[in-house]
Amino acid sequence: MSSPVLIEIKSRYPQMNEAMRRIADYVISSESDIIYLKASDFAEKSGVSTASVSRFVKLLGYKNFNEFRLKMAVTEEKNVNEKPEEKDRLVYNGEAIGKSPYEVSKTIFSKSIRELEDTWNMMDFDILEPVANLIDRANRIVAIGVGRSKITTEALVSRLYRIGYYIVDFCDSHEIVNITSILKEGDLLIAVSNFGQSKSVVEGVKRAKRRGVTVVGITSVKDSPLAQYSDYVLFSAYDYASDKMGKLYEPSSENVAQLVLVDCL
């Protein structure tokens, strides 16, 4: 399980500029070293200015670097008793060459387990009941998502349809334009985008909002456009490794976390 600080950093990573990403990369790779560093030393090791460090910790909600470092120290103390092999099994760099089928499978399963644990730690349980009530009262329920987000929208349709709710989903950009142009007050739009930046999804949300439609967003990235425009947001854990490895690597763990969020509704 990632620490609360790392979960917060990873959830904001896609929205960070280059300097902040350097800092985030250093924190994620050298978590235990930070508690011994001064702000100037931390900036030097991260390859950024002290001003960038100040902006970074304030983005995470801390007044200054010392407060951030104290939080990291508390987290490190909690992790002292964690078994080394338990920590090692959760390290995933995408390299499968030379590993046995058992090792590869164990790594993939461990990755999904950690994504679920991190998603649990990000949960805002206070919005689950209001969102469930919106689903129950909505005149019409529409889910939108492109690419692999369609996996989540299809699961949502399957679950709600089986218990008596009429819901449809759209994954084509033109269809999203059409449906969000005719939704009206009393309807519910559920929008899914892992990074929260899919243009057709975000534009669809904005279009629906102008028509008085309530929007529930499902995303991994805080402060993303989808999160900003949604009335309610369900956050799933962000896969930092997939971002570092590029678009060719799309782990199922992110979809698993979103599917479990759907089950919670």
Where are these regions (language model features)?
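Glycine-rich phosphate/diphosphate-binding loops that line cofactor/substrate pockets in enzymes
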Residues: 126-138
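CheY-like receiver
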Residues: 26, 131-134, 179
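HTH-adjacent hinge/linker in prokaryotic transcriptional regulators
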Residues: 2-6, 15, 32-36, 40, ...
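Pre-recognition alpha-helix immediately N-terminal to the DNA-recognition helix
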Residues: 22-28
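Short helix-coil-helix linker/hinge
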Residues: 16-22
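Glycine-rich phosphate-binding loops that contact phosphosugars or nucleotide phosphates
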Residues: 136-260, 264
